[in-house]
């Protein structure tokens, strides 16, 4: 029987914080050092867009804690209006975070530019990007069906506004905040449910918490002084390693220096409620973010996961694919509601999960905002083809199931894991052992 044991010190740096650190550095006056920047394709796309829009970006490898090699990024800027007109469309590849959040910055620059991406990104909805920026005074043009390319005619005369987000979205909240930094006056962003709050934490923005909403206050045209950033390990990447340990009985794994921001690590509480053998140790605060070690000691398995609370869904939206596959394989059951946002990710993740789980013999039923796994009616004989839909989280979720259970799965376009987890397979090999 295959089990997984060891100490993980090479988990990818947090993708969300890496994006934001680079963008905030480009808006700051002076030189910013970002330690432990992500090597994932998405974060490298952000650096590429910054370079091609005139920002000085340097990247090098340095020795860090636990003897690991990490990336240090150094970004030099003169402040809010340091960008220059690009000579070609800005390529975001597969990174929706890059395309959406950079739109907010570029809408405030006095030139025209275009943001493009790969085939998957060019299908994703961008109207939610255009609407607030148009209200602030930028000219934004999309394709007829509301997708990229995003053509931006920016202006230094952006207006502040009060904007209520129609759905919880950390990317849309952040792009408005980045645009608002350039505007005259004070902007207020109202979110009905809390989304990940890295932008507020990193910029030190005031947040007003009311009964049914949160208000983020962004003062306009404030000087941002360069400051260093340290990027902790990505909790979304940690979820895959946790699932690996929980699916393979007898596994013992420690994951070091993981971001435990409550808006990112809520899935840990969910798993604890399901009687999963996990714990947290060595908690501390670095750069405003809670960081700690996650311990996995799997002796008893877990109970089925049923997810419906809208706030919880907003917090764990990226981890749902892995949690669904984990619950299905470990218990034969899973239930999800209020997660329609999953249909607008790198793939329609509800459809992708249901299609692949059905191929593996699970009885599933999907709804507009979720799906249910009722039971496993058969275990297919021989190798089963899994369709990744060119989505890194779908590919990794089923790869974890294959590694932990020994089932033979042939996953299409498996190289897509490099979007967020370049050392995914090498890390699994390091942890693998025979019981």
Swiss-Prot record:
Single GO molecular function: 3-phosphoshikimate 1-carboxyvinyltransferase activity
EC number: 2.5.1.19
Principal cellular location given in the protein's record: cytoplasm
Stored Pfam families: EPSP_synthase (PF00275)
Keywords: Amino-acid biosynthesis, Aromatic amino acid biosynthesis, Cytoplasm, Transferase
InterPro entries, per database record: Enolpyruvate_Tfrase_dom, Enolpyruvate_Tfrase_sf, EPSP_synthase, EPSP_synthase_CS, RNA3'P_cycl/enolpyr_Trfase_a/b
Places the protein is found: Cytoplasm
GO CC field: cytoplasm
One GO process term, biological-process aspect: chorismate biosynthetic process
Entry annotation: catalytic residues: 318
This protein's pathway: Metabolic intermediate biosynthesis; chorismate biosynthesis; chorismate from D-erythrose 4-phosphate and phosphoenolpyruvate: step 6/7
Subunit and partners: Monomer.
General function of this protein: Catalyzes the transfer of the enolpyruvyl moiety of phosphoenolpyruvate (PEP) to the 5-hydroxyl of shikimate-3-phosphate (S3P) to produce enolpyruvyl shikimate-3-phosphate and inorganic phosphate.
Protein name according to UniProt: 3-phosphoshikimate 1-carboxyvinyltransferase
């Amino acid at each position: 029987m295959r089990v997984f044991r060891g100490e993980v010190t090479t988990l990818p740096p947090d993708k969300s914080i890496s994006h934001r650190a680079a963008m905030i550095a480009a808006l700051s006056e002076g030189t910013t050092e970002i330690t432990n920047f992500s090597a994932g394709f998405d974060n490298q796309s952000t650096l590429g867009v910054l370079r091609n829009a005139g920002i000085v970006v340097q990247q090098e490898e340095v020795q860090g804690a636990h003897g690991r090699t990490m990336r240090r990024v150094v970004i030099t800027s003169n402040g809010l209006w340091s960008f220059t007109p690009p000579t070609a469309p800005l390529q975001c590849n597969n990174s929706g975070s890059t395309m959406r959040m950079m739109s907010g910055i570029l809408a405030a620059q006095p030139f025209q530019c275009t943001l493009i991406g790969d085939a998957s990104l060019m299908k994703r909805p961008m109207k939610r990007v255009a609407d607030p920026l148009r209200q602030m005074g930028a000219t934004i043009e999309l394709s007829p069906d509301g997708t990229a390319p995003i053509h931006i005619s920016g202006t230094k005369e952006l207006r502040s506004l009060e904007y209520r987000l129609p759905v919880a979205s950390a990317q849309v909240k952040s792009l408005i905040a980045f645009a608002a930094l350039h505007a005259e006056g004070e902007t207020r962003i109202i979110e009905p449910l809390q989304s990940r709050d890295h932008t507020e934490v990193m910029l030190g923005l005031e947040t007003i918490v009311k009964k049914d909403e949160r208000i983020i206050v962004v003062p306009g045209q404030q000087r941002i002084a360069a400051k260093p950033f340290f990027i902790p390990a990505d909790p979304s990447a940690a979820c895959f390693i946790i699932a690996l340990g929980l699916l393979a009985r007898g596994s013992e794994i420690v994951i070091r220096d993981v971001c435990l921001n409550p808006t990112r690590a809520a899935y840990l509480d969910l798993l604890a409620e399901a009687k999963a053998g996990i714990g947290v140790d060595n908690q501390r605060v670095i750069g405003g973010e809670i960081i700690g070690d996650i311990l996995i000691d799997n002796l008893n398995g877990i109970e089925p996961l049923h997810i419906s609370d809208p706030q919880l869904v907003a917090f764990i939206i990226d981890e749902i694919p892995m949690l669904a596959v984990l619950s299905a394989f470990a218990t034969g059951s899973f239930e999800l509601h209020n997660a329609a946002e999953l249909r607008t990710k790198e793939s329609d993740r509800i459809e992708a999960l249901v299609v692949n789980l059905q191929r593996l013999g699970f009885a599933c039923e999907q709804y507009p905002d979720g799906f249910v796994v009722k039971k496993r009616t058969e275990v297919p004989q021989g190798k089963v083809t899994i369709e990744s839909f060119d989505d890194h989280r779908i590919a990794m979720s089923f790869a974890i199931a294959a590694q932990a259970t020994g089932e033979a799965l042939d996953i299409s376009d498996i190289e897509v894991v490099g979007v967020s987890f370049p050392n995914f397979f090498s890390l699994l090999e390091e942890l693998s052992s025979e019981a």
